[in-house]
UniProtKB/Swiss-Prot annotation:
Keywords of the record: Cytoplasm
Cited InterPro entries: P-loop_NTPase (IPR027417), TLDc_dom (IPR006571)
Top-level taxon of origin: Eukaryota
Domain TLDc: 1-147
Species whose genome carries this gene: Mus musculus
Cross-referenced PANTHER family: INTERFERON-INDUCED PROTEIN 44
Gene3D superfamilies, sorted: P-loop containing nucleotide triphosphate hydrolases (3.40.50.300)
Cellular component aspect of the GO annotation: cytoplasm
Protein name: Interferon-induced protein 44
Gene name per UniProt: Ifi44
Family membership noted in the UniProt record: Belongs to the IFI44 family.
Record's keyword annotation contains Cytoplasm: yes
Amino acid sequence: MAMRTRLTWQQEKCLQNYFGGKRFCLLYKASVQKFSHQNLLCTCENQGPTMIVVYSEKCVIGMYLKEGFQGKDVSITIFALQETGFSLCAKGPDSPYLLFHKRKTNDFSILLDEKAVIVSSAICKMLQLTARNNVIPIQECEAFRCEELLDERKTRGIAVLHSNLLQALRDYKPYGDLVQQTRVLLLGPIGAGKSSFVNSVKSVFKGSITHQILVGCDEDGISDKYRTYSIKAKDDSDPLPFILCDSLGLGENAGLHTDDVWHILKGHTPDRYQFDSMKPITSNHPNYTHDPLLKDRIHCVVFVFDINSFEMHSSELVAKIKKIRRDLIKHGILHLALLTHVDSLDLITKEDMTDIYNYSPVKSKLEAFHGVFGFALSDILVVSNYVSEWQLDPVKDMLILSALKEILYTANEFLEDLPLNK
């Protein structure tokens, strides 16, 4: 029968995040392999980075050895997980072997044969522990090998997927050659990450981080013009066959006017048009496109939301967005939702992001978003935009490219469904 850790899912995620996104492989469990420091040390030698965890009645205490058990002094991080939170302190360099023996000079010892941890008053204070006579009884002890979450095999798989997605998007063609470039409109609340998504797509295809579009945290939004952005692949002078259209954010009483949405959709709004939230564009505007062609129209709409804040939008803004959705459905315009900042969800790790749609907290967020806005679960995409990074990350790239692929395929479905006279 396989051993199972006593760590809860939340405790494991907290430790993974703090210690650099590690996978914990259970090596030793005292209740199975006896409360014996000899058994523990024999199991843990030459295993690389190691974590020892003991369970008391009220908390979890442990130590992390980045260099593992070696015949030399190493740096040790002692930590405690309690209902009130996570606390830690650094110790050493010291011999990890000696921490399993009772010594007067030890300020922290794990005595397995006595089922107790000896903790000095100073460490108790730093870790906010309560110890009677500096002794904490323990019920269990476990040892883990700490592995990199993204092992070489998985890293190779991500690289292959990244390459395949890039090639698929380079080979993408609008349905039936009806247009040279499909147009995708990004709509959503102020600060949701619309402009950052455009920057992120540009960065992935360029092969380096770019911040061509100004982004920020202004409460009224940074984008105040209608902008159309073509994307170029690295070392390619020709733009790719799609255009990302950025707009002023939607607000409760301010932001993008709903009438402007329809002028954009129908292809009347020129690039660099300056929005006025109180006054939508009219046919009297000098650059108004009076007879737009199919190439000028929007072929797919993407509603962009911050995955951490969509549940906090006012009922007025939610109603406004739902009204736009109903009108899109009425006119047969296909649309998707894109949830940004998925990497900032509590306790998420890089490995979780490699299988993001099966990650339990993301699934819960998608269900919640479906409940608020009514999007089908299959129409909700998630990404992590490049906001403050200076280097590309293959896992982020994979999410961005996967989302873009779904968006462009949806645009093709719209073009395919057009009446012949369109």
